Amino acid sequence: MVKLAFSRELRLLTPAHFTFVFQQPQRAGTPQITILGRLNSLGHPRIGLTVAKKNVRRAHERNRIKRLTRESFRLRQHELPAMDFVVVAKKGVADLDNRALSEALEKLWRRHCRLARGS
């Protein structure tokens, strides 16, 4: 049976981890959200989130975006390539409802899977 936990080892925790992804990322994005990815040598994917107060003013909206993004990652973690991902929320992401945000994330995860197979 597949485990769908979201443990500490599946998160980017230090600034060095984020910098690693920002240096040479593969990009997949929509006008509201961008996912940067870079292959890692760990054998499993990891995720980091950046939801700036400048782009999403209200704390409950930032929390909702982060919660939905983590849940989307948690459910797809076994299909994703061994990459470090940084999800960057842009202006307008707070205007998306939960379903639209989830669908956008699914589309971006699939695009990253295709990009990883191509490289």
Curated annotation (Swiss-Prot):
It is an enzyme of class 3 (hydrolase). Its EC number is 3.1.26.5. Pfam families: Ribonuclease_P. PROSITE patterns: RIBONUCLEASE_P (PS00648). Keywords: Endonuclease, Hydrolase, Nuclease, RNA-binding, tRNA processing. The keyword Cell membrane does not apply. Signal peptide: none annotated. One of its GO terms (molecular function) is ribonuclease P activity. GO terms for biological process: tRNA 5'-leader removal. Consists of a catalytic RNA component (M1 or rnpB) and a protein subunit. This is Ribonuclease P protein component. The gene is rnpA.
